[in-house]
Design a protein with these regions (language model features):
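A membrane-cytosol interface segment of integral membrane proteins
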Residues: 248-293
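Structural signature of hydrophobic alpha-helical transmembrane segments
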Residues: 15-26
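Short, strongly hydrophobic alpha-helical membrane anchors
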Residues: 1-12
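Loop-to-helix transition at the N-terminal end of transmembrane alpha-helices
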Residues: 13, 17, 41-55
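Membrane-interface helix termini and inter-helical loops of multi-pass transporters
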Residues: 3-5, 75-92
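Membrane-embedded catalytic scaffold of the fatty acid hydroxylase/desaturase
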Residues: 55-71, 78-80, 92-250
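Membrane-interface helix-loop junction between the first two transmembrane segments
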Residues: 27-48
Length: 293
């Protein structure tokens, strides 16, 4: 029991920082909203899911975390060693920014490649969609929806992102912190309910308008814009769709589905698994078994 309590306490600083940053985004959302009069009830449900994510994810990461350590020990400290110090030789004032700001952008760009395919699989593989659908059930998209995420998603990302990145790159703690910070802030930004069109930068860096299309249930937007930071991956792999001028569509699940209770949504992947386990066999195999009886 003490381990459980210690784990929850360890998440409190991250939760505090998260909600303070979300609060600042909320102020901006009130000033320049993309969607006016969002439901306070919906925003409250986002907050509940945020808390459940921060509380449950550390427990879900215990086994995957051990696998990351094992892979790192097996393959060493990364196959790719990036060193940009030569670019700033003799320019002391540029050395720190290059090492700690520019250098992490390289693995961040590659991480987005892995995220693109992870995200695409979440939409194409039914078993992965059962947990990811919670994120898309947000009918009022705002910064809080960034962590309206099922606790199962984080351990799954270990296999599609963390381990591949750990094998490829050797990054120090400072660079790793910058990467994590950048990803978190980008997540808040792209989900924010703010009317900030990027204009010519739209296909270069992901923004709220472009990501809003990904959350749209409209057929023309479905299964589009998977990248989290750099739309180039969607452009290269044929899943990019640009927003029309002034286009800020409604968001939510396709086919008019709506989210259920918090408890139901968190248990939903296991509900689906249980139903499949109880579903009678069908098809040729079932026919043969029926004939044998």
């Amino acid at each position: 029991m003490s381990f459980v309590w210690e784990t929850i306490l360890a998440t409190l600083p991250a939760m505090k920082a998260h909600f303070l940053i979300v609060l600042s985004f909320t102020v901006v959302e009130l000033l320049i909203p993309a969607e006016r009069r969002q439901s306070s009830l919906e925003r409250g449900s986002h907050a509940v899911y945020n808390i459940s994510y921060f509380v449950l994810s550390p427990f879900a990461m215990i086994l995957p975390g051990a696998l990351v350590v094992a892979f790192t020990r097996r393959f060493g400290p990364g196959l790719i060693h990036l060193n940009l110090d030569g670019l700033t030789a003799g320019i002391a004032t540029l050395s720190w920014p290059v090492r700690n700001l520019l250098l992490p952008l390289v693995p961040l760009f590659v991480a987005d490649f892995f995220y693109y395919w992870h995200h695409r699989l979440q939409h194409r593989v039914p078993a992965l969609w059962t947990s990811h659908r919670l994120h898309h059930s947000a009918e009022g998209l705002n910064a809080l929806a960034s962590y309206r995420v099922h606790w199962l998603e984080e351990p799954l990302r270990v296999f599609t992102m963390t381990i591949p990145m750990g094998i490829l790159f050797n990054i120090n703690a400072v660079q790793g912190a910058w990467i994590a910070f950048a990803l978190a802030q980008m997540g808040l930004l792209i989900h924010a309910n703010v009317r900030i069109p990027y204009g010519p930068l739209t296909p270069v860096i992901l923004g709220p308008q472009l990501h809003r299309l990904h959350h749209s249930p409209a057929p023309e937007h479905r299964d589009r814009n998977y990248a989290a930071n750099f739309p180039i991956w969607d452009i290269l792999f044929g899943t990019y769709v640009a927003p029309k001028r002034g286009e800020w569509p409604a968001t939510g699940l396709p086919d008019g589905e709506h989210a259920h209770s918090v408890a139901y949504e968190l248990a939903y992947p296991f509900v689906v698994l249980w139903r499949k386990a109880r579903t009678p066999l069908s098809g040729p195999k079932a026919a043969k078994e029926s004939e044998a009886k």
